[in-house]
């Protein structure tokens, strides 16, 4: 299954959740691939600290194959399964170049992503692929959502962000009949208690969308600045335990097949 982890605004914890879910599934024995598609603000390189000859940017620009981009990090993290990571180029020059890309390039990049899902799922036999996308309605994030089987939307309780998220799901995800699940992050304790009494659904427009996770704000995680993979290094941390429950819910959303361009309502 390909999961695009998306948000309406930056700063929701999208990358942290992408990273820890990917590592958790690999820890469970799955073959997992994590791709940094936040080309305008890449951050996974902070965790993995690798200098690559080829980046995701190069793959999307047809300068290399995806095999040239992926790095197997399984042995470094001691996982039961496999975790391969594709990093975006964090240099200022590369970020400026991505920001200047026109619509024609973005359309060609969509074709590369469609080809990528076939290679990752059919040729390289990954069980799960996580796209850590750019926030908002950038072409690159829309491309990732279109290509994925599931859009996993990370939001907070901020009123403006919640409203923007609702509009994004209603106007974009519904357009592509995209299967969607929601994570609400950085919730204060009072709201979290109220959330636990709900039925696990949120209404947007005329449809009900599943909430697969409700996470409080953890100050110690903020202080780590992405250096720790909690689900592997601190499996008993409350954040890790909550993601374990979240992973069970995501497994149940697995489509019947992930080898076509699935768009499931």
Regions found by a protein language model. Name each.
Residues 39-40, 90-93, 136, 158-160, ...:
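Conserved nucleotide-binding/hydrolysis micro-motifs of P-loop NTPases
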Residues 39-121, 223-226:
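P-loop/Walker-type NTP enzyme "switch/lid" segment
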Residues 128, 150-153, 181, 211-213:
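Well-ordered beta-strand positions
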Residues 2-69, 127-128:
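Walker A/P-loop NTP-binding active-site region of P-loop NTPases
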Residues 105-110, 226-265:
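NTP-binding/hydrolysis catalytic cores, primarily Walker-type P-loop NTPases
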Residues 186-189, 198-232, 243:
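Beta-strand-loop-alpha "switch" segments that mediate conformational coupling across diverse proteins
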Residues 124, 138-159:
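Inter-motif core of Ras-like GTPase G domains
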Residues 165-177:
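Conserved C-terminal guanine-recognition region of P-loop GTPase G domains, centered on the G4
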């Amino acid at each position: 299954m390909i999961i695009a982890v998306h948000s309406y605004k930056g700063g929701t914890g999208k990358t942290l959740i992408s990273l820890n879910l990917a590592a958790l599934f690999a820890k469970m024995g799955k073959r997992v691939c994590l791709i940094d598609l936040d080309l305008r603000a890449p951050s996974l390189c902070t965790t993995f600290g690798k200098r690559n000859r080829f980046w995701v940017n190069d793959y999307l620009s047809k300068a290399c194959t995806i095999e040239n981009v992926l790095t197997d990090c399984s042995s470094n993290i001691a996982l039961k399964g496999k975790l391969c990571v594709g990093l975006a180029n964090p240099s200022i020059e590369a970020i400026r170049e991505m920001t200047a890309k026109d619509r024609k390039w973005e359309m060609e990049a969509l074709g590369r992503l469609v080809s990528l899902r076939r290679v990752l799922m059919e040729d390289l036999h990954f069980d799960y692929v996580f796209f850590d996308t750019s926030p908002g309605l950038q072409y690159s994030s829309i491309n990732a959502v279109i290509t994925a089987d599931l859009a996993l939307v990370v939001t907070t309780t901020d009123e403006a962000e919640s409203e923007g998220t609702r509009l994004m799901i209603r106007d974009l995800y519904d357009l592509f009949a995209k299967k969607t699940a929601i994570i609400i992050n950085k919730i204060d304790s009072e709201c979290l208690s109220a959330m636990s009494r709900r039925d696990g659904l949120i209404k947007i427009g005329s449809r009900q969308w599943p909430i697969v996770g409700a996470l409080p704000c953890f100050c110690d995680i903020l202080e780590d600045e992405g250096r720790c993979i909690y689900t592997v290094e601190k499996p008993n941390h409350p954040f890790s335990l909550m993601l374990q429950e979240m992973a069970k819910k995501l497994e149940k959303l697995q489509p019947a097949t992930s080898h076509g361009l699935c768009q499931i309502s």
